C-alpha cells in the first residue's frame, strides 16, 4: 500500500512539474494537475493541501535530489579551499540544470506575491545553508578558518558561487553556463572566500 501511495505521489509531482513549468505558478491550477494525473482534485489535495505546498514539493524533489550530493564534498579532513571548490562545482552543476533554472525563474517572478518564496526558503535553502554553516563551524574549531558568524559566511560563499554567469543566465541575459565556466566560478568563489576567511 505504501509503495502505491509513493508511486501516486511521484506521479503527481511529475505532472505538477510540467504544468508549473508551462504555465507558471499563478496560471497553473490544481484541477489541471489532477486532470493530467488522471485523478480527482480530492485525491490531489489529500497529498498536497495547497498549490503552494505542491509547488514547493516539486522544487524540492527535483532540485534537492540534484543538490544533495554536493554536501558530500564537504569533508572535514580535506583542505578548506579544496573542499569548497569541490562543493561549489557540484552545487553549481546542480542548480544550473534547465529545470532548476526554470523553477528559479518562476520563484523569482511570483515568490513574493504568492507566498511560495518563504515556504521554499524554509524547507530548502535554509536547510542547505545550515548544513554548510555547520561545516564551516567545524573548520573554525579545527583552526582552518577565522572565527566569524558561520551562517553569514555560508550565505556569502553561496552568493560568490552564484554571481556572474549563472546569475546572468537566470536573469535571461545570456545562455546556459558551460562546464568550464562552472569550474572557473567555483574555483574563484573558493579562492576569494578563503583569502578572507581562511587561515594558512
Please tell me what each predicted stretch does:
Residues 11, 15, 19-53, 57-58:
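Helix-turn-helix
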Residues 58-87, 93-95:
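Amphipathic alpha-helical linker/stalk segments
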Residues 118, 136, 140-191:
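Hydrophobic/aromatic-rich alpha-helical bundle segments in the mid-to-C-terminal region
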Residues 8, 51, 58, 62-63, ...:
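Hydrophobic/aromatic residues within well-ordered alpha-helical segments
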Residues 14, 81-97, 101, 105, ...:
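Amphipathic alpha-helical segments that line or abut small-molecule/effector binding pockets
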Residues 1-7, 200:
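N-terminal intrinsically disordered/low-complexity leader segments
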Residues 94, 102, 116-142, 184:
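Amphipathic alpha-helical packing segments from all-alpha helical-bundle domains
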Residues 95-119, 166-171:
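Amphipathic alpha-helical segments used for helix-helix packing
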Amino acid at each position: 500500500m505504501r509503495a502505491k501511495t509513493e508511486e501516486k505521489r511521484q506521479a503527481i509531482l511529475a505532472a505538477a512539474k510540467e504544468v508549473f513549468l508551462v504555465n507558471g505558478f499563478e496560471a497553473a491550477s490544481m484541477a489541471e494537475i489532477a486532470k493530467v494525473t488522471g485523478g480527482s482534485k480530492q485525491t490531489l489535495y489529500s497529498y498536497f493541501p495547497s498549490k503552494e505546498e505542491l509547488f514547493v514539493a516539486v522544487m524540492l524533489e527535483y532540485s534537492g535530489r540534484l543538490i544533495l550530493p554536493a554536501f558530500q564534498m564537504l569533508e572535514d579532513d580535506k583542505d578548506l579551499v579544496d573542499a569548497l571548490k569541490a562543493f561549489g562545482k557540484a552545487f553549481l552543476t546542480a542548480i544550473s540544470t534547465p529545470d532548476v533554472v526554470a523553477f528559479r525563474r518562476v520563484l523569482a517572478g511570483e515568490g513574493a506575491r504568492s507566498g511560495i518564496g518563504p515556504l521554499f526558503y524554509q524547507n530548502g535553502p535554509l536547510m542547505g545553508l545550515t548544513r554548510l554553516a555547520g561545516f564551516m563551524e567545524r573548520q573554525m574549531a579545527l583552526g582552518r578558518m577565522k572565527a566569524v558568524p558561520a551562517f553569514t559566511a555560508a550565505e556569502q560563499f553561496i552568493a560568490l558561487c552564484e554571481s556572474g554567469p549563472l546569475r546572468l543566465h537566470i536573469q535571461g541575459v545570456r545562455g546556459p553556463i558551460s562546464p568550464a565556466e562552472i569550474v572557473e566560478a567555483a574555483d574563484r568563489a573558493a579562492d576569494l572566500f578563503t583569502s578572507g576567511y581562511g587561515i594558512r
